[in-house]
Regions:
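Conserved alpha/beta-hydrolase catalytic His-Asp/Glu region
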Residues: 119-125, 133-192
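Conserved hydrolase catalytic core segment
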Residues: 80-120
């Protein structure tokens, strides 16, 4: 929307389109297994948010609403009518913002290890601390963060692969992204939603379903046992089955 280059992968045909949004510091290749799995039945899109993967980083506003507009720009470029939005981590709030920009087009939002508690505002102090941590020692901060996103006995090859893919995010983009989240009120955005909100979450951090239902009475979550922050790369077959079930339920 602001002229920044957006790079995305697209496969298949058929609506609703499935649109996959990665988390902070990640990139679209985290969803390669979903493009392959769902392309026979749906148009599947996975994009790199600005500052991530192959997308550009020439922008001044880095908020979650701006990322939501980026998602809509890609969806519009692909002439998609109806769609379901999937968002991992930061991609969850981004999916909410994208849905709010596209009334009547989104059939639902599915968080992927996100929305553990939707009544949440990100404080400036919290993001400033995180931004400074990454600015000082990006590689060290990334390693420490990834250590908190997997179970201790997770497959070391999968953990190393995630770290390698995330190490390509420029530190300046990481800092801008963290600072751009300050003051974002997820609860207020969720209250405005008129489409179903779902989550496929790991069990590393608890999901407060009852608290979420106070804001969004139709909220539902499926918890994958002994899975961390990236179920799509940790147990792709099980994850894909849950995605298919969720899509079927939202389309019915």
């Amino acid at each position: 929307p602001d002229g920044v280059e957006l790079v995305y992968s697209v496969a298949g045909q058929g609506e609703p389109a499935l649109v996959f949004i990665h988390g902070g510091l990640a990139e679209r290749s985290f969803y390669d297994g979903q493009l392959a799995e769902f392309a026979p039945r749906h148009k599947v899109i996975a994009l790199d948010l600005p500052g991530h993967g192959e997308s550009g980083s020439d922008r001044t506003k880095w908020g979650i609403p701006e990322f939501g507009a980026d998602v809509m720009a890609v969806v519009d470029a692909e002439k998609v009518g109806q769609l379901i939005l999937f968002g991992n981590s930061l991609g969850g709030p981004v999916a909410v913002e994208a849905a709010l920009l596209m009334p009547g087009r989104a059939l639902g939002i599915v968080g992927i290890d996100t929305f553990q508690g939707v009544d949440y505002t990100i404080s400036l102090e919290e993001v400033r601390e995180r931004a400074e941590f990454f600015e000082k020692d990006y590689a060290g901060a990334l390693k420490e963060m990834i250590g908190l996103l997997f179970h201790k006995d997770a497959d070391p090859a999968i953990v190393a692969d995630a770290e390698k893919r995330m190490s390509g995010t420029p530190p300046e983009a990481a800092k801008a992204m963290f600072l751009g989240m300050a003051g974002y009120d997820l609860g207020a955005a969720v209250r405005r939603l008129t489409v179903p909100l779902r989550a496929i979450n790991g069990d590393l951090y608890p999901t407060d379903v009852e608290a979420n239902r106070k804001l969004k009475p139709d909220f539902e979550a499926v918890i994958m046992e002994h899975i961390g922050h990236y179920p799509m790369i940790e147990r792709p077959e099980e994850f894909n089955r849950l995605v298919a079930e969720t899509v079927d339920a939202l389309v019915r």
